[in-house]
Amino acid sequence: MVDRWAADLEPAGFWWLPAPEANPVGGLVRHIGIASVRLLYRGRGEEIPEPFRSLPPEQLRPTHEAPEAVLEEFRGNMRFVREGLAALREADLEAPRQWGSNPPVRALYIFDHICNHAQHHAGQIITTRKLWNARRAS
């Protein structure tokens, strides 16, 4: 779904901010990929590697990188997540995992959050793209 709404955007639309506190499509694409990998590591009870430790404000900011480079990073991250989820066993889903300051939760809830989180931000990408299209049409 991300490719459908983001892949053909020119750089101006990919990094456009519809409002001062809003996020650009490019930042949302990057954030979905990085956060999904981070959640996979957290759900597996593994240490999160340095490249995936950046916080959302850093991931979401406009960098004006080439859209294709950001999309390739996203695709690679999501491929890694799909492969990681496919390799899980039932015992992996039931394992207690620490998540923030909450009491431990079943890893399944963290893995489920990968989908919920990505879907939420994909909706933002769609909305931002529609706003960009409307702006360009007027």
Show which residues each predicted segment covers:
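Short, contiguous alpha-helical
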Residues: 3, 11-58, 97-138
